């Protein structure tokens, strides 16, 4: 699921076996709930990403299902802090790791874990957060 038709078309070119949906993530619901939702570099493009976390928890995941989120744009990753200005993408939200963890907790996720992958120099790495419904 992606809000960009260009990304959907690219995915279809690279992988003809699976189904892809172009939709606003806050409006879309799967026909059947799933066990795993993985997202990379998406959540901070939402004005209120906590609403998306709640929506996935309530409408996409089975009981015991897992959300896995990866983002590079977060406060502790200093080189990413000026992306909003560098890219002129005004909707990018910058939050701390603790704020992202609070979004998961508030939605109801349990067994929440977080870590950074790919740390190198000033680059703090991709922040990965996962939790279970």
What spans do the regions from the language model cover?
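Conserved beta-strand signature within the Rossmann-like core of class I S-adenosyl-L-methionine
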Residues: 64-72
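Short catalytic micro-motifs in class I SAM-dependent methyltransferases
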Residues: 41-42
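Short alpha-helix
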Residues: 91-107
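Class I SAM-dependent methyltransferase SAM/SAH-binding core
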Residues: 1-27
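Short, glycine-/aromatic-enriched active-site segment of Class I SAM-dependent methyltransferases
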Residues: 72-91
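A short glycine-rich, Lys/Arg-flanked "PGG" loop and its adjoining helix->strand segment in the class I
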Residues: 50-64
């Amino acid at each position: 699921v992606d809000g960009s038709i260009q990304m959907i078309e690219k995915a279809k070119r690279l992988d003809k076996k699976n189904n892809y949906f172009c939709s606003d993530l806050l409006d879309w619901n799967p026909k059947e709930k799933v066990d795993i939702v993985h997202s990379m570099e998406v959540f901070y493009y939402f004005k209120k990403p906590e609403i998306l976390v709640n929506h996935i928890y309530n409408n996409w995941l089975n009981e015991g299902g897992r959300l896995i989120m990866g983002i590079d744009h977060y406060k502790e990753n200093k080189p990413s802090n000026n992306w909003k200005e560098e890219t002129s993408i005004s909707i990018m939200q910058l939050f701390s790791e603790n704020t992202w963890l609070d979004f998961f907790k508030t939605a109801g996720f349990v067994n929440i874990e977080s870590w950074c992958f790919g740390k190198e120099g000033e680059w703090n790495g991709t922040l990965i957060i996962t939790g279970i419904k």
